[in-house]
Structure formats: C-alpha cells, structure tokens
Amino acid sequence: MLSKEVVALLNEQINKEMYAANLYLSMSSWCYEHSFDGAGAFLFEHAREESDHARKLITYLNETDSKVELKEVKKPDNDFKSLLDVFEKTFEHEQSITASINNLVDFMLSSKDYSTFNFLQWYVSEQHEEEALFRGIVDKIKLISDNGNGLYMVDQYIKSLINK
C-alpha cells in the first residue's frame, strides 16, 4: 500500500497529464484551423499519448489498492500566435512536466518508496525523449522563420514524426 502522500502526488500527476492531453488537443485544433494539417495530426496523436500517461498512473494506483481521485482539469489555452508559438509552448509545457516527474522521483527516493521510484523511471526516460523531440521541432521552425514555403515543409516534417 502506498502512503497517503504518494497517492496524493500521483493523483496530481494524473491531472497534469490530462491537462497536457487537453492542451495538445487545443493546439491540434489551432493547427488544423490554420492549415497546418501535419502538425494538427501530430499533436492530436500526442494528446492520446498524454492520456495514456495518465492511464498508466491510474493503473499503477489501482494495482497498489490506492484511491484514484480524478479532479477537474483546467481549461487549456486555445489562442496561439503562430506555429512557432504553439511548439514553444509545447516545449515549455514538457519542461514543466519533466520538473514535476523529477520532483516525484526525488520524493520517492527520499521516502524510500523504491517500487514507485522504479515505476517512475519510465516517465523519466519518456520526458527525455519528449523534450528532445519538441526542442528539435522548435529549432526547425526557427530555421525557416515565417517563410510560407518553409512553413509548409516544416508542417510535412512534423507530420512525418507521428508514431516515431
């Protein structure tokens, strides 16, 4: 059985993962609205991955006979200035999730909850991949600036990242 503090922290992380899913759905819709269909499809798929992260946490809590407490998910932003703005905000959000996961890992280690510490290692690895992915997208968008042809090409590149 997990401690009450651990259960509370994991429930908070579920909420953060669900917020990320909703944020990426909002960003996906913005991309489709502005004819960035590749980026829209990519972010739509990424929203599914974020909800999978929440489900993985829910499963862990269920497997440990702990109480899952789903809370209200904050409304995500839906007003973006550009494709670069979308992906800069995505990258910033992933950095905040990484910080949250790192705090969880630190807490588990200091409280000697080695099972949950081990479980969270998947998230540590996942966040490393996420940050590298989104940093790369931001860098590519910055390379082409606001050039119409370049934006089309970067949209196609982003689409190619689905399921990689």
Give the positions of each predicted feature:
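Iron-associated oxidoreductase/ferritin-like identity signal
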Residues: 1-164
